[in-house]
Amino acid sequence: MNFLAHLHLAHLAESSLSGNLLADFVRGNPEESFPPDVVAGIHMHRRIDVLTDNLPEVREAREWFRSETRRVAPITLDVMWDHFLSRHWSQLSPDFPLQEFVCYAREQVMTILPDSPPRFINLNNYLWSEQWLVRYRDMDFIQNVLNGMASRRPRLDALRDSWYDLDAHYAALETRFWQFYPRMMAQASRKAL
Protein backbone atom coordinates (compact mmCIF):
# COMPACT_ATOMS: atom_id res chain seq x y z
CA MET A 1 0.00 0.00 0.00
CA ASN A 2 1.08 3.54 -0.62
CA PHE A 3 0.01 6.87 0.87
CA LEU A 4 -3.67 6.93 -0.09
CA ALA A 5 -4.46 3.37 0.96
CA HIS A 6 -2.67 3.76 4.30
CA LEU A 7 -4.61 6.94 5.02
CA HIS A 8 -7.90 5.36 3.94
CA LEU A 9 -7.45 2.22 6.03
CA ALA A 10 -6.34 4.31 9.02
CA HIS A 11 -9.52 6.38 8.72
CA LEU A 12 -11.69 3.26 8.57
CA ALA A 13 -9.92 1.85 11.63
CA GLU A 14 -10.15 5.17 13.50
CA SER A 15 -6.37 5.11 13.77
CA SER A 16 -3.93 8.00 13.49
CA LEU A 17 -3.71 9.14 9.88
CA SER A 18 -0.54 11.00 10.85
CA GLY A 19 1.14 7.88 12.19
CA ASN A 20 0.09 5.79 9.22
CA LEU A 21 1.53 8.31 6.77
CA LEU A 22 4.66 8.96 8.84
CA ALA A 23 5.60 5.28 9.28
CA ASP A 24 7.87 4.93 6.23
CA PHE A 25 9.99 7.79 7.57
CA VAL A 26 10.53 6.32 11.04
CA ARG A 27 13.11 3.63 11.76
CA GLY A 28 13.11 1.38 14.79
CA ASN A 29 10.97 1.90 17.86
CA PRO A 30 8.90 5.11 17.57
CA GLU A 31 7.70 5.11 21.17
CA GLU A 32 10.37 7.51 22.44
CA SER A 33 9.67 10.11 19.76
CA PHE A 34 5.92 10.31 19.18
CA PRO A 35 2.64 10.37 21.14
CA PRO A 36 0.83 7.04 21.69
CA ASP A 37 -1.81 7.57 18.99
CA VAL A 38 0.85 8.31 16.36
CA VAL A 39 2.87 5.29 17.54
CA ALA A 40 -0.23 3.11 17.16
CA GLY A 41 -0.66 4.44 13.61
CA ILE A 42 2.97 3.65 12.78
CA HIS A 43 2.51 0.10 14.04
CA MET A 44 -0.73 -0.27 12.05
CA HIS A 45 1.08 0.85 8.89
CA ARG A 46 3.79 -1.74 9.45
CA ARG A 47 1.22 -4.51 9.99
CA ILE A 48 -0.59 -3.51 6.80
CA ASP A 49 2.67 -3.65 4.84
CA VAL A 50 3.44 -7.17 6.07
CA LEU A 51 -0.14 -8.32 5.48
CA THR A 52 -0.31 -6.84 1.98
CA ASP A 53 3.05 -8.25 0.90
CA ASN A 54 1.89 -11.73 1.93
CA LEU A 55 -1.56 -11.68 0.32
CA PRO A 56 -1.86 -14.40 -2.34
CA GLU A 57 -3.17 -11.85 -4.85
CA VAL A 58 -0.14 -9.61 -4.31
CA ARG A 59 2.36 -12.47 -4.38
CA GLU A 60 0.81 -13.62 -7.66
CA ALA A 61 0.98 -10.11 -9.14
CA ARG A 62 4.70 -9.84 -8.30
CA GLU A 63 5.31 -12.88 -10.51
CA TRP A 64 3.94 -11.00 -13.53
CA PHE A 65 6.91 -8.65 -13.50
CA ARG A 66 9.82 -9.33 -15.80
CA SER A 67 13.06 -10.57 -14.24
CA GLU A 68 14.69 -7.16 -14.61
CA THR A 69 11.89 -5.40 -12.69
CA ARG A 70 10.77 -8.08 -10.24
CA ARG A 71 13.05 -6.69 -7.52
CA VAL A 72 11.07 -3.42 -7.48
CA ALA A 73 7.67 -5.05 -7.99
CA PRO A 74 6.59 -4.53 -4.34
CA ILE A 75 7.17 -0.77 -4.61
CA THR A 76 5.52 -0.54 -8.02
CA LEU A 77 2.50 -2.50 -6.83
CA ASP A 78 2.10 -0.29 -3.75
CA VAL A 79 1.80 2.72 -6.05
CA MET A 80 -0.56 0.85 -8.37
CA TRP A 81 -2.93 -0.09 -5.55
CA ASP A 82 -3.23 3.64 -4.82
CA HIS A 83 -4.05 4.20 -8.49
CA PHE A 84 -6.97 1.79 -8.31
CA LEU A 85 -8.15 3.22 -4.98
CA SER A 86 -8.09 6.77 -6.34
CA ARG A 87 -9.75 5.69 -9.58
CA HIS A 88 -12.53 3.78 -7.82
CA TRP A 89 -12.80 5.97 -4.73
CA SER A 90 -16.46 6.90 -5.33
CA GLN A 91 -17.40 3.20 -5.30
CA LEU A 92 -15.29 2.33 -2.27
CA SER A 93 -16.04 5.42 -0.19
CA PRO A 94 -19.26 6.90 -1.60
CA ASP A 95 -20.05 8.99 1.49
CA PHE A 96 -16.68 10.77 1.66
CA PRO A 97 -15.63 12.30 -1.68
CA LEU A 98 -11.92 11.96 -2.40
CA GLN A 99 -11.19 15.69 -2.44
CA GLU A 100 -12.87 16.09 0.97
CA PHE A 101 -10.97 13.10 2.32
CA VAL A 102 -7.68 14.58 1.11
CA CYS A 103 -8.42 17.87 2.92
CA TYR A 104 -9.37 15.96 6.06
CA ALA A 105 -6.20 13.82 5.89
CA ARG A 106 -4.02 16.89 5.36
CA GLU A 107 -5.48 18.57 8.45
CA GLN A 108 -4.72 15.46 10.51
CA VAL A 109 -1.15 15.16 9.26
CA MET A 110 -0.32 18.86 9.68
CA THR A 111 -0.68 18.50 13.46
CA ILE A 112 2.53 16.44 13.71
CA LEU A 113 4.57 18.16 11.03
CA PRO A 114 6.62 20.42 13.34
CA ASP A 115 8.03 17.37 15.17
CA SER A 116 8.56 15.20 12.09
CA PRO A 117 11.71 14.05 10.26
CA PRO A 118 12.92 16.41 7.49
CA ARG A 119 12.19 13.89 4.70
CA PHE A 120 8.57 13.63 5.89
CA ILE A 121 8.25 17.41 5.98
CA ASN A 122 9.64 17.54 2.44
CA LEU A 123 7.11 14.94 1.25
CA ASN A 124 4.29 17.02 2.71
CA ASN A 125 5.51 20.09 0.84
CA TYR A 126 4.49 18.31 -2.40
CA LEU A 127 1.93 15.66 -1.49
CA TRP A 128 -0.86 18.09 -0.69
CA SER A 129 -0.10 21.12 -2.87
CA GLU A 130 0.35 18.98 -5.99
CA GLN A 131 -2.72 16.84 -5.22
CA TRP A 132 -0.86 13.52 -5.49
CA LEU A 133 -3.62 11.47 -3.87
CA VAL A 134 -6.21 12.68 -6.37
CA ARG A 135 -3.80 12.49 -9.32
CA TYR A 136 -2.99 8.84 -8.58
CA ARG A 137 -6.06 7.97 -10.68
CA ASP A 138 -4.14 9.09 -13.79
CA MET A 139 -1.71 6.48 -15.15
CA ASP A 140 0.52 9.20 -16.60
CA PHE A 141 0.98 10.48 -13.06
CA ILE A 142 1.78 6.94 -11.85
CA GLN A 143 4.52 6.78 -14.47
CA ASN A 144 5.84 10.15 -13.24
CA VAL A 145 5.81 8.88 -9.64
CA LEU A 146 7.83 5.79 -10.57
CA ASN A 147 10.29 7.87 -12.62
CA GLY A 148 10.65 10.35 -9.76
CA MET A 149 11.42 7.61 -7.24
CA ALA A 150 13.97 6.13 -9.63
CA SER A 151 15.62 9.53 -10.08
CA ARG A 152 15.94 10.09 -6.34
CA ARG A 153 17.26 6.60 -5.63
CA PRO A 154 19.51 5.25 -8.39
CA ARG A 155 19.46 1.71 -7.00
CA LEU A 156 15.72 1.72 -7.78
CA ASP A 157 16.24 2.63 -11.44
CA ALA A 158 14.24 -0.45 -12.50
CA LEU A 159 11.12 1.42 -11.34
CA ARG A 160 11.22 3.29 -14.66
CA ASP A 161 10.79 0.06 -16.62
CA SER A 162 8.28 -1.45 -14.20
CA TRP A 163 5.73 0.83 -15.85
CA TYR A 164 5.62 -1.63 -18.76
CA ASP A 165 4.67 -4.47 -16.42
CA LEU A 166 1.78 -2.42 -15.05
CA ASP A 167 0.61 -1.59 -18.54
CA ALA A 168 0.84 -5.21 -19.71
CA HIS A 169 -1.14 -6.55 -16.74
CA TYR A 170 -3.45 -3.62 -15.98
CA ALA A 171 -6.75 -5.53 -16.12
CA ALA A 172 -5.44 -8.46 -14.08
CA LEU A 173 -3.99 -6.10 -11.46
CA GLU A 174 -7.31 -4.29 -11.21
CA THR A 175 -9.06 -7.63 -10.68
CA ARG A 176 -6.62 -8.53 -7.89
CA PHE A 177 -7.18 -5.13 -6.26
CA TRP A 178 -10.93 -5.78 -6.17
CA GLN A 179 -10.29 -9.20 -4.67
CA PHE A 180 -8.25 -8.02 -1.69
CA TYR A 181 -8.87 -4.33 -0.97
CA PRO A 182 -12.53 -4.59 0.09
CA ARG A 183 -11.44 -7.35 2.52
CA MET A 184 -8.82 -5.02 3.96
CA MET A 185 -11.42 -2.27 4.29
CA ALA A 186 -13.65 -4.65 6.26
CA GLN A 187 -10.74 -5.63 8.49
CA ALA A 188 -9.92 -1.98 9.10
CA SER A 189 -13.53 -1.21 9.98
CA ARG A 190 -13.44 -4.06 12.52
CA LYS A 191 -10.11 -2.70 13.82
CA ALA A 192 -8.52 -6.02 12.86
CA LEU A 193 -5.49 -4.62 11.04
Curated annotation (Swiss-Prot):
Pfam families in the cross-refs: ACP_PD
This protein's UniProt keywords: Fatty acid biosynthesis, Fatty acid metabolism, Hydrolase, Lipid biosynthesis, Lipid metabolism
Hydrolase in keyword set: yes
Source species, domain of life: Bacteria
UniProt GO BP: fatty acid biosynthetic process
Family: Belongs to the AcpH family.
PANTHER family reported in the protein's UniProt record: ACYL CARRIER PROTEIN PHOSPHODIESTERASE
Entry function: Converts holo-ACP to apo-ACP by hydrolytic cleavage of the phosphopantetheine prosthetic group from ACP.
Protein name (database record): Acyl carrier protein phosphodiesterase
The encoding gene: acpH
